[in-house]
């Protein structure tokens, strides 16, 4: 069986989608699974053994461009896919499998995609609370799984593969010392500071960890580089020698490898949080207005700290510098306690 998956366009969603690929492979061991997704996803997809080929989606996230999608769909006809699974909810994301003439096209209804999809599932959000469960449900025939409780347990969570050789090579590439174990920080998050733990809290935690004998490495995109510099600036000269701001300095694949080399990760609710979970790194995840009830880190080594309940549609924080008060209220001491408990568990 040949399967095409139209993948998501965000790092976190792409990571969670691996649970669908793992479930499909478990159900259909002979299946060939290709994933169409933005080209930047390739480093993630190449580390998922279930994925045969990552096909770049050349069209932008917001562009409809029906003519281009028709052309793209027609170019895939020679691959003769048997099934398609469409993970984004947008109308446009269902066009390529339709134009490719794939006989069985599955997805949640989303933007009223009757016709484009011929195996349409209507989402009951209460029956399927987690995004990862919604992805996995698509692997089963319609009506068989009525709620998340019906899914076979344990769920096949995302797992990325990184070799020891890659870790030592990439640490050398970035001149990271082997003298001290690394703790990774992921201080960025989409939509600005509202989902971020304040940089001054990260700085305070970094000071304590460096004084305890760790080195701290900051990960993220170029957009997060400034936040990283703010953390660095709060350290004294001696401490700065053991803190590296690699936000915007690494390719995604290098960040994946270096996160795998870390003893543990402290992170906001971000795409890299899901990467760290898939690498089975001990991690402390800090949530504010966004909710871990929908997209938690999928790992038994994750600890979530959140001081409020419910989901808050907040794109701007309510306090100075745009931070959300519920994240300001999470103290560095509380995070350090959770982190130390995880590190002790790991050593045991």
UniProtKB/Swiss-Prot annotation:
What EC identifiers does the entry list? 2.4.99.24
Q: Does the keyword Methyltransferase apply?
A: no
Entry GO CC: cytosol
Tell me the InterPro entries matching this sequence. Answer: Glyco_trans_9 (IPR002201), LPS_LOS_Heptosyltrfase (IPR051199), RfaF (IPR011910)
Give the domain of life.
Bacteria
Q: List the molecular function annotations (GO) for this entry.
A: ADP-heptose-lipopolysaccharide heptosyltransferase activity
**Alphabetically ordered keywords of this record:** Glycosyltransferase, Lipopolysaccharide biosynthesis, Transferase
Q: Which GO terms describe its biological process?
A: lipopolysaccharide core region biosynthetic process
- Provide the reaction this enzyme catalyses: an L-alpha-D-Hep-(1->5)-[alpha-Kdo-(2->4)]-alpha-Kdo-(2->6)-lipid A + ADP-L-glycero-beta-D-manno-heptose = an L-alpha-D-Hep-(1->3)-L-alpha-D-Hep-(1->5)-[alpha-Kdo-(2->4)]-alpha-Kdo-(2->6)-lipid A + ADP + H(+); L-alpha-D-Hep-(1->5)-[alpha-Kdo-(2->4)]-alpha-Kdo-(2->6)-lipid A (E. coli) + ADP-L-glycero-beta-D-manno-heptose = L-alpha-D-Hep-(1->3)-L-alpha-D-Hep-(1->5)-[alpha-Kdo-(2->4)]-alpha-Kdo-(2->6)-lipid A (E. coli) + ADP + H(+)
Q: What happens when the gene is disrupted?
A: Deletion mutant synthesizes shorter LPS without the outer-core oligosaccharide and cannot produce flagella, demonstrating that flagella assembly in E.coli depends on the length of LPS.
User: Which segment of the chain is annotated as a signal peptide?
Assistant: none
Q: How does activity depend on pH?
A: Active in a broad range from pH 5.5 to pH 10.5.
**Pathways involved:** Bacterial outer membrane biogenesis; LPS core biosynthesis
Q: Which PANTHER family does the protein's record reference?
A: ADP-HEPTOSE--LPS HEPTOSYLTRANSFERASE 2, TETRAACYLDISACCHARIDE 4'-KINASE-RELATED
Family per record: Belongs to the glycosyltransferase 9 family.
Protein purpose = Glycosyltransferase involved in the biosynthesis of the core oligosaccharide region of lipopolysaccharide (LPS). Catalyzes the addition of the second heptose unit to the heptosyl-Kdo2-lipid A module. The analog ADP-mannose can serve as an alternative donor in place of ADP-L-glycero-D-manno-heptose, but with lower efficiency.
**What is the recorded name of this protein?**
Lipopolysaccharide heptosyltransferase 2
Lineage of origin: Bacteria, Pseudomonadati, Pseudomonadota, Gammaproteobacteria, Enterobacterales
**Its encoding gene is what?**
waaF
């Amino acid at each position: 069986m040949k399967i095409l998956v139209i993948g998501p366009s965000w790092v976190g969603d792409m990571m969670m989608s691996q649970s669908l690929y793992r479930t499909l492979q478990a159900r259909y061991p002979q299946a060939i699974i290709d994933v169409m997704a933005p080209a930047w996803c390739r480093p993630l997809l190449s580390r998922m053994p279930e994925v045969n080929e990552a096909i770049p989606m050349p069209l932008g996230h917001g562009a409809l461009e029906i003519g281009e999608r028709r052309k793209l769909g027609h170019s895939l006809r020679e691959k003769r896919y048997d099934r398609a699974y469409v993970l984004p909810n947008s109308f446009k994301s269902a066009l390529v499998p339709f134009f490719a003439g794939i006989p069985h096209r599955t997805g949640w209804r989303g933007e009223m995609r009757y016709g484009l999809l011929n195996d349409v599932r209507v989402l009951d959000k209460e029956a399927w609370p987690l995004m990862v469960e919604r992805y996995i449900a698509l692997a089963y025939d319609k009506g068989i799984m009525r709620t998340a409780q019906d899914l076979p347990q344990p769920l096949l969570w995302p797992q990325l593969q990184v070799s020891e050789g890659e870790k030592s090579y990439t640490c050398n590439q970035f001149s990271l010392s082997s003298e001290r174990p690394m703790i990774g920080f992921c201080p960025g998050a989409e939509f600005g500071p509202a989902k971020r733990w304040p940089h001054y809290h990260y700085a305070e935690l970094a000071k304590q960890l460096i004084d305890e004998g760790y080195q701290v490495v900051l990960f993220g995109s170029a957009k997060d580089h400034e936040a990283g510099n703010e953390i660095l600036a709060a350290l004294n000269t001696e401490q700065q020698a053991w803190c590296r701001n690699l936000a915007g300095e690494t390719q995604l694949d290098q960040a994946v490898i270096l996160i795998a080399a870390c003893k543990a990760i402290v992170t906001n609710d971000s795409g890299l949080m899901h990467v760290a979970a898939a690498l089975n790194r001990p991690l402390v995840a800090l949530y504010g207005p966004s909710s871990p009830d929908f997209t938690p880190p999928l790992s038994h080594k994750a600890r979530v700290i959140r001081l409020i309940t419910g989901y808050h549609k907040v794109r701007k924080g309510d306090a100075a510098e745009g931070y959300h008060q519920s994240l300001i209220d999470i103290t560095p001491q509380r995070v350090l306690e959770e982190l130390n408990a995880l590190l002790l568990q790991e050593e045991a």
